[in-house]
Amino acid sequence: MTLLQERLFAMQDKQYAAFQAKLTPGVPVESFIGIRVPVLRKFAKEFTKEAECEDFLHQLPHEYYDENMLHGLLISEVKDYEECIRLTENFLPFVDNWAVCDIMSPKVFAKHKKELSAKIKTWSKSSHVYTCRFGIETLMSHYLDKDFKTEYLEIPASVRSEEYYVKMMVSWFFATALAKQWDATISYIEQHRLAPWTHNKTIQKAIESYRITPEEKEYLRTLKIK
């Protein structure tokens, strides 16, 4: 066991490990240490100041799920854009579950929207489930507000995948887009631009959203594919 692993096990909550394992199917139960996210997030902020941090970011693959979660949190704190992209692309092939994928949210991306959009297009076309999911999630996080362009909707709309965690992210994206950019997005639902399962899941998520008006929800119900 490495020194870092010893430090991680010192934060272990075995009941939480069992809980995480149930939420993350496909990941071996024995790979969960069981560190609560707020605790791990606090540790990550301190660990970024340590010399061992850089070594850890190059030691792939990791043995434990919690190490991968830590890796994602550390990438989120990297301040140099080019370095962040390099570390992200080195790590993505090793991401094997939705939780690690979704914990990554690099703060530096917000300052580099122009360059980032090209990366998002590449990631979203990936055949690797979680690289594709990360690309769509990053688009959703950064390009549905003041930086929105209608053409960005084509990126997730063009994704063709039978992978559950990709389809769910496309649905999540379009439900969020309906909430934030209704006029530009509704035609994708009206014209059945999405696969039937994704189409209906988008409508379901949008109807569950407090950001969609009652009138919009009523209209969306008429657009379900039966």
Regions found by a protein language model. Name each.
Residues M1-K226:
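Alpha-helical scaffold domains
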